[in-house]
Amino acid sequence: DRYWREVFDPVAEECGLEKTAPTDQRYFNDDYIAVFDKTEDAMERLLEEDTPENRVRAYCHYHLGVESVLAQTGYYGLSSAFSESGSDEIALGDWPNSQGLVNGISKIRSDEGRHVGFGMSKVRGYVQNGDVDESVVQDVLQDLMPHIAGTVSDFQENINPVPLVNYARDKLTRRIEIITDEDAEIPEVDELVKLDEESSAAAD
């Protein structure tokens, strides 16, 4: 809230725009709400019945669906729009260069990378030990993917959503491969959160 009050609100006022709250419903479409409703349901199910499969479902919803695929796609889109990095196909028209904003986002990515790595490690352990079938992971993430695509596609102008959807789909596929492939290894945190333009390992 503080960042919103001290950064967004003054700019909105100066530009003659309506000041809104960061939790204003207009910012959350039906697909975004569905992602978090399903995540909440998975957490509630775990509280009711703490089993390996329910743990994996919870990890897949939060650590992989939300904090990994959805968040990473958002960071990629912001970096593409507000800096020289990312994809030239996403931002249409003129966008301000806000490298400071992108640098700040990179700090958030680093923090969330630890969460993603933790979740992937837990899920991979259950799958590779034979406690949970890999189909559970695939089912959860494939169920979330249309909602993730719907979230990152919800732009009325100046954004081409196709590269974002492709990025999210590729990221989800790579996460599943790392978890289900016996010979795969979970990347280090710094590699895990790199965006595509930063390293060839960004698909990890």
Which functions belong to the PLM regions below?
Residues D1-D204:
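Non-heme di-metal
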